């Protein structure tokens, strides 16, 4: 997983200046937004400048070794750049699972908070003594918690559960985040309504596995995700709901029916498949087979022909043979997946797979990663070529990172941060970010589309 820094700031004038750096996934970002909200409500002010901050909060990621290395790099940079009197608060997944790797820098840390203890950020900052709090309790179980959005004002993430009940062989998330803990339906709907009231137009539902939502709350251990979606869709308005992280065995007919019947529940799903070969899937301790995966994808494409499917695959899992890898290449080449994340297997201490025999060399993993990436790129180029000349409804996210002469936009098949975008090079009609426009696709550059604005969507 690639990590992305998120920096939170506003103009700060007091002596209680805080500077946040959040690494890792969108779930981590929500935790950072909650901590920021708590501190702003308590009277602290956020600053963009690390060097002028009185308190520096680093929310770490530990999903893969590369993420842990990045967390350590940021910590060293903070220690070196901060003013002498500033205090560092360290939180997040790395603290919860890999604290021993942080040992050389712990003398510089004022307070350590586990990933389930974000609601204690205020007491950590105000503590006169250095300390730590590492528990498995989640703020999801608490009452109302303030939150300060760091995303553009038109979209936001809504975390409906924490932890994971799956036990995939390659993953250490359950040991970091603990077991499944679902928010109550009432709390979710309350947050959903608040986001709509704030003007958010795209709400992205996240959890370790959305489909597991409510299995810890219901007597029959069945998913209650459909209840969440039905309650949300009762709210009036022209908003988008996007689902991320929905395991293949949790996509049932009820979810498909809702996507088919209400366009506000976007025809977009992120289904982490990880592999397609049955022996590898079994070794990964996955609960679906190749046949079940193909049945699901066929059903989705048949019921909702315009659906966009995102997924992720791991290459170089222990014992993966050339033939088994070729099965994956053949599957990807068939074009089932629109947006794809590809990762080399990472031998994570504490995972079942870490102790498996037949670990694959890094050179082989890198070669397989390149082959699969090239295979998917051919699919994307073919698909993008078919989109040229079509008109799509898309939201303007903001300026392109390379030039303020360009804008970026997304249609329903593109999630923020993780998917390609539309590069808008003709935008004279755009009057504001976060608004939806009809955009003609005129070309593509790599994975990204290129387009021009035709007109604003009526009602925007």
From Swiss-Prot:
GO terms for biological process: tRNA modification. Residues 150-382 form the Radical SAM core domain. [4Fe-4S] cluster 1 binds at residues 25, 61, 93. Gene3D superfamilies: Methylthiotransferase, N-terminal domain (3.40.50.12160), Nucleic acid-binding proteins (2.40.50.140), tm_1862 like domain (3.80.30.20). Its EC number is 2.8.4.4. GO terms for cellular component: cytosol. It catalyses: L-aspartate(89)-[ribosomal protein uS12]-hydrogen + (sulfur carrier)-SH + AH2 + 2 S-adenosyl-L-methionine = 3-methylsulfanyl-L-aspartate(89)-[ribosomal protein uS12]-hydrogen + (sulfur carrier)-H + 5'-deoxyadenosine + L-methionine + A + S-adenosyl-L-homocysteine + 2 H(+). CDD domains: Radical_SAM. It comes from the Bacteria. [4Fe-4S] cluster 2 binds at residues 164, 168, 171. Residues 16-130 form the MTTase N-terminal domain. Keywords: 4Fe-4S, Cytoplasm, Iron, Iron-sulfur, Metal-binding, S-adenosyl-L-methionine, Transferase. It is found in: Cytoplasm. Belongs to the methylthiotransferase family. RimO subfamily. Catalyzes the methylthiolation of an aspartic acid residue of ribosomal protein uS12. This is Ribosomal protein uS12 methylthiotransferase RimO. It comes from Chlamydia caviae (strain ATCC VR-813 / DSM 19441 / 03DC25 / GPIC) (Chlamydophila caviae). The lineage of its organism: Bacteria, Pseudomonadati, Chlamydiota, Chlamydiia, Chlamydiales. The gene is rimO.
């Amino acid at each position: 997983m690639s990590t992305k820094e998120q920096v939170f700031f506003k103009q700060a004038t007091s002596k209680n200046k805080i500077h946040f750096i959040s690494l890792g996934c969108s779930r981590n970002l929500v935790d950072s937004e909650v901590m920021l909200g708590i501190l702003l409500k308590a009277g602290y002010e956020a600053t963009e400048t690390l060097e002028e901050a009185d308190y520096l909060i680093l929310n770490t990621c530990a999903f893969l070794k590369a993420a842990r290395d990045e967390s350590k790099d940021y910590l060293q940079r903070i220690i070196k750049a901060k003013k002498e009197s500033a205090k560092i608060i360290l939180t997040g997944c790395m603290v919860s699972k890999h604290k021993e790797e942080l040992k050389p820098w712990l003398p510089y840390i004022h307070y350590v908070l586990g990933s389930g203890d974000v609601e204690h950020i205020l007491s950590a900052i105000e503590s006169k003594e250095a300390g730590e709090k590492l528990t498995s309790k989640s703020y999801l179980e608490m009452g109302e918690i303030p939150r300060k959005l760091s995303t553009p004002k038109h979209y936001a993430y809504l975390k409906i559960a924490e932890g994971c009940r799956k036990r995939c062989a390659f993953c250490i998330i359950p040991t970091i985040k603990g077991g499944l803990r679902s928010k109550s339906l009432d709390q979710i709907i309350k947050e959903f309504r608040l986001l709509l009231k704030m003007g958010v137009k795209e709400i992205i539902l996240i959890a370790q596995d959305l489909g597991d939502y409510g299995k810890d709350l219901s007597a029959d251990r069945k998913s209650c995700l459909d209840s969440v979606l039905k309650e949300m869709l009762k709210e009036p308005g022209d908003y988008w709901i996007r689902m991320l992280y929905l395991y293949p065995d949790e996509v049932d007919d009820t979810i498909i029916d809702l996507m088919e019947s209400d366009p506000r529940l976007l025809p977009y799903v992120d289904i982490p498949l990880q592999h397609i070969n049955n022996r590898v899937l079994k070794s990964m301790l996955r609960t679906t087979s190749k046949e079940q995966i193909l049945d699901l994808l066929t059903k989705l494409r048949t019921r909702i022909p315009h659906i966009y499917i995102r997924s992720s695959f791991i290459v170089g899992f222990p014992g993966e043979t050339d033939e088994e890898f070729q099965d994956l290449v053949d599957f990807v080449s068939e074009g089932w997946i629109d947006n794809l994340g590809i990762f080399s297997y990472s031998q994570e201490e504490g995972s079942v797979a870490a102790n498996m025999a037949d670990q694959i060399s890094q050179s082989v993993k890198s070669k397989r990663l390149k082959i699969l990436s090239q295979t998917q790129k051919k699919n994307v180029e073919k698909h993008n070529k078919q989109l040229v000349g079509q008109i799509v409804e898309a939201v303007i996210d903001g300026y392109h990172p390379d030039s303020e002469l360009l804008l970026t936009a997304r249609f329903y098949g593109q999630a923020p941060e993780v998917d390609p975008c539309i590069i808008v090079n003709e935008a004279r009609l755009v009057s504001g970010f976060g608004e939806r426009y009809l955009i003609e696709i005129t070309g593509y550059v790599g994975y990204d589309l290129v387009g021009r604005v035709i007109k604003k969507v009526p009602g925007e």
